[in-house]
Amino acid sequence: MKTAIFTVVLALAVFAVLSFGWEANEKALSEEFTELIHEKEAASETEARECRYFWGECHDHMPCCDWLVCRYKWPITYNIRVWNRTFPEK
């Protein structure tokens, strides 16, 4: 009888330790995933901020994104930025 109780208590202790380990691992993975998401968001915000001038007024000497070019559109009397049919390399 004592052996059975000891075995049950020992098994519960092992399960508690394993559960704690899995929980710690899951928390570490969750933190890593959150950091990765924040990095991706920061990168996309930078890219969007750099290229916010689509269809905006421009001149040939103004800086622009690699895939946007300054074109004169008639009958509009100013130049606008349009896509140059290329894709940015990542």
Swiss-Prot record:
Keywords: Disulfide bond, Ion channel impairing toxin, Knottin, Secreted, Signal, Toxin. GO terms for cellular component: extracellular region. SUPFAM superfamilies: omega toxin-like. It is found in: Secreted. Residues 20-50 form a propeptide. Residues 1-19 form the signal peptide. The keyword Disulfide bond applies. It comes from the Eukaryota. InterPro entries: Huwentoxin-1. Disulfide bonds join 51-65, 58-70. Coiled coil: none annotated. GO terms for molecular function: ion channel inhibitor activity; toxin activity. Belongs to the neurotoxin 10 (Hwtx-1) family. 13 (Hntx-13) subfamily. Ion channel inhibitor. The presence of a 'disulfide through disulfide knot' structurally defines this protein as a knottin. This is U7-theraphotoxin-Hhn1k.
